């Protein structure tokens, strides 16, 4: 195949800027999918993606346009799924920068554009939704030039919803995006593994971008990270349904089935090469992202532990950022500690486990990795608050800090700065983008951001603010472990790490919430928040009382007293042996303790 006729590209856009709609129009205009078969958000295969109106998993599809072959790699736009974007950009030569004509550049768009610029991709600016009454094309063009530093003079104006300007986009892909680098078929194979998923019949299917050489059915290849060898049984392209081929050549994007049965054998971002004619070094520039938060997942039914284990293994195949290890809790039994890229990432996984594998999950409150220096000089990295040493054994605690870049209209500046101060933020800079928009830069503790920062940011700015962040370093902080006792017993899964200055209001807020959420029992349940051995907040869940005197009528009052005394003794006995039922909402209550006020 002539390399000069191939174009590989991705679409960069913020949530709701019309990326999946543009992908639909391209599929429709090129007759890749007939109008009859085309569904909205055609490349978003998960029900969750369609319901939430977001792209979670990337998708790769081959499109024929005149004599050219395009490989469109559809990418997510949410901050939690940056790792998906980095994968797709590593497999392309160009990117369509899609910006909403009424909303302009958003923080996550900018983060992804910088990723594209780092990969030396050709960027084509496209302004979408030009048919909206609130569209301001000139303002958006100026924003693109001032913020990103690329010319927007020839930006393509489109309405993806109404199909306006789609042909201009296709012509720009042909004329502006460079073809893949030429390579001889005899060159050693180098192919980037940019995605994978588990097929119950064929094992792990890997998606690759061939950079040099070629790969054919029957070839034996190896992963360069772990040297494991497999033979190609089937390979082909997605158009968007899978189409089998005999070989994939340099510049092509396709899938490979090789009877890979073990999920852990595939590492997304790895390079594959042929055993007979191996490449000397893997492809450069791929970054493996590290989880930023950790959560405990426990099956409600302890019999489902093995099902949860198998389900996580299958899902982790198509989501390489998930890291998990077994853990146990006195309150919840056996489960897993799972690393995520953010709260949305965690919610998506929990929903997938419940929908696709019929699991009922209890998720504990998220935490981050803390660096703890013990009094004997030993340094530990701990992500589970219940594993923290006692306070008298801790010399210092360091927590991860992020550099947050927040884009917002000028009118919301005061409220957003107040939010950052509430979250223990350290002011860094304020940049003026234009007459109306500002970029606010703060250093913030990561543990404060993973809870509700994104929701509160959107709420305070009426949805107009957006932000991106990167973890920069660890800093010493005055942190303490807050434990919760129910009926005198420590519930390890409810432990949390709080800043010393906010411990009392947080403890008070949490005990009040738990009092409302935990159902009443037939015995009184004290809810206590403790630091070390000191109780700093307490609430009591009153017992419900069965009317043991209902059967009495008339008669002696001593009979009534006797029954009530018997009930009282029974409750006392039940209190000492009783088990308190803790619903899922109790763990979620920790997420909603926003009290960062002294």
UniProtKB/Swiss-Prot annotation:
InterPro entries: EF-4, EFG_III/V, EFG_V-like, EFTu-like_2, G_TR_CS, LepA_C_sf, LepA_CTD, LepA_IV. GO terms for cellular component: plasma membrane. The keyword Nucleotide-binding applies. Its EC number is 3.6.5.n1. It is found in: Cell membrane. Keywords: Cell membrane, GTP-binding, Hydrolase, Membrane, Nucleotide-binding, Protein biosynthesis. Signal peptide: none annotated. CDD domains: EF4_II, EF4_III, LepA, lepA_C. Residues 4-181 form the tr-type G domain. Required for accurate and efficient protein synthesis under certain stress conditions. May act as a fidelity factor of the translation reaction, by catalyzing a one-codon backward translocation of tRNAs on improperly translocated ribosomes. Back-translocation proceeds from a post-translocation (POST) complex to a pre-translocation (PRE) complex, thus giving elongation factor G a second chance to translocate the tRNAs correctly. Binds to ribosomes in a GTP-dependent manner. Belongs to the TRAFAC class translation factor GTPase superfamily. Classic translation factor GTPase family. LepA subfamily. This is Elongation factor 4. It comes from Mesomycoplasma hyopneumoniae (strain 7448) (Mycoplasma hyopneumoniae).
């Amino acid at each position: 195949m002539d390399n000069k006729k191939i174009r590989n590209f991705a679409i960069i856009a913020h949530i709701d800027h019309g990326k999946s709609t543009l992908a639909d129009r391209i599929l429709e205009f090129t007759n890749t999918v007939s109008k009859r078969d085309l569904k909205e958000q055609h490349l978003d295969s998960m029900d969750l993606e369609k319901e939430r109106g977001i792209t979670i998993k990337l998708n790769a599809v081959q499109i024929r346009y005149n004599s050219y072959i395009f490989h469109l790699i559809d990418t997510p736009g949410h901050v939690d799924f940056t790792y998906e974007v980095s994968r797709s950009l590593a497999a392309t030569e160009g990117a369509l920068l899609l910006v909403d004509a009424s909303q302009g550049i958003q923080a996550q768009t900018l983060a992804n554009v910088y990723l594209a610029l780092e990969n030396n991709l050709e960027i084509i600016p496209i302004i979408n939704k030009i048919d909206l009454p609130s569209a301001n094309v000139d303002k958006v063009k100026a924003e693109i030039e001032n913020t990103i530093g690329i010319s927007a003079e020839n930006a393509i104006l489109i309405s993806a919803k109404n199909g306006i300007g789609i042909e201009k986009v296709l012509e720009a892909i042909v004329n502006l995006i460079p073809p893949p680098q030429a390579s001889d078929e005899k060159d050693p194979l180098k192919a980037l593994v940019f995605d994978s998923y588990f097929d119950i019949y064929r094992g792990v299917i890997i998606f690759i971008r061939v950079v040099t050489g070629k790969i054919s059915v029957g070839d034996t290849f190896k992963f360069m990270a772990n040297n494991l060898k497999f033979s190609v049984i089937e390979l082909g392209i997605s158009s968007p349904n899978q189409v089998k081929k005999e070989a994939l050549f340099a510049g092509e994007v396709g899938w490979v089935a090789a009877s890979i049965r073990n999920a852990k054998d595939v590492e997304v971002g790895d390079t594959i090469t042929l055993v007979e004619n191996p490449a000397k070094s893997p492809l450069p520039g791929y970054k493996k992202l590290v989880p930023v938060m950790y959560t405990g997942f426990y099956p409600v039914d302890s019999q489902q532990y093995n099902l949860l284990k198998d389900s996580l293994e299958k899902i982790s195949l198509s989501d390489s950022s998930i890291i998990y290890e077994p853990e146990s809790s006195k309150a919840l039994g056996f489960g897993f500690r799972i690393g995520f890229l953010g709260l949305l990432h965690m919610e998506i996984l929990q929903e997938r486990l419940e929908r696709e594998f019929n699991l009922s999950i209890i998720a504990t409150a998220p935490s981050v990795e803390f660096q703890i220096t013990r009094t004997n000089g030993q340094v530990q990295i701990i992500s589970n608050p219940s594993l923290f040493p006692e306070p008298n054994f801790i010399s210092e605690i360091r927590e991860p800090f992020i550099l947050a870049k927040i884009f917002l209209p000028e009118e919301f500046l005061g409220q957003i700065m107040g939010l950052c101060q509430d979250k223990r933020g350290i002011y860094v800079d304020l940049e003026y983008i234009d007459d109306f928009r500002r970029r606010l830069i703060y250093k913030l503790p990561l543990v404060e951001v993973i809870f509700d920062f994104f929701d509160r940011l959107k709420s305070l700015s009426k949805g107009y603010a957006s932000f991106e962040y990167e973890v920069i370093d660890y800093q010493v902080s005055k942190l303490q472990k807050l434990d919760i006792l129910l009926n005198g017993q420590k519930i390890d899964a409810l432990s949390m790490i709080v800043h010393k200055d906010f411990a009392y209001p947080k403890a008070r807020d949490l005990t009040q919430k738990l009092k409302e959420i935990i159902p009443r029992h037939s015995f009184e349940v004290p809810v206590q928040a403790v630091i070390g051995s000191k109780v700093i907040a307490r609430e009591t869940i009153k017992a419900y009382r069965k009317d043991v005197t209902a059967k009495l009528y008339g008669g002696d009052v001593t009979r009534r007293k006797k029954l009530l005394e018997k009930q009282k003794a029974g409750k006392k006995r039940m209190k000492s042996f009783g088990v308190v039922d803790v619903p899922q909402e109790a763990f979620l209550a920790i997420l909603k303790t926003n009290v960062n006020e002294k």
